[in-house]
Design a protein with these regions (language model features):
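Non-catalytic signal-transmission and effector/linker regions of two-component phosphorelay proteins
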Residues: 1-14, 24
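Active-site residues of response regulator receiver
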Residues: 64-67
Length: 136
């Protein structure tokens, strides 16, 4: 918790979630809503929905499933990179193959495997909000 206290001085990190699985989206929403370090602004079930919302309601961090329906993670990151107020993105997915490398190459600021602990996931989001790149 020192990362939050020392570097953000108590300001909440604004965040948006994107996942096509309603169960995952609900579970992740609850995790972020219960953590006072974050302010969950919106959720989206598709890449297009995420893009539309993040353009209307800028946030510091976007957390997306690599396999977000329609555009997918790589294309969504590519589109967002061209936007002046785009959030820093954390991608999460199964840690198989070269997804972490692909996420980094696409321009994501972080990657978290679905097998990581909740606390590690949250700490990655905090670090990314502070400008760090984290690929676990």
């Amino acid at each position: 918790m020192a990362l939050w206290d020392d570097q953000t001085k108590g300001e909440r990190v604004t965040l948006m979630l994107g996942d096509g699985n309603p169960l995952m989206l609900t579970a992740m929403s609850e995790i972020f809503e219960k953590d006072r370090r974050f302010s969950l602004v919106a959720t989206a079930a598709t890449a297009e929905g995420f893009l539309g919302m993040v353009m209307r309601m800028p946030v510091q961090v976007g957390v997306i499933d690599w396999n977000l329906p329609a555009l997918g993670g790589a294309r969504l990151i590519d589109v967002l990179r061209a936007q002046p107020n785009a959030p820093r993105l954390v991608v999460y997915a199964e840690d198989t193959g070269d997804i972490p490398r692909k996420a980094m190459a696409a321009g994501a600021a972080g990657f978290v495997s679905r097998s990581e602990s909740v606390e590690r996931f949250l700490e990655t989001c905090l670090a990314v909000a502070k400008g760090q790149m984290v690929f676990t």
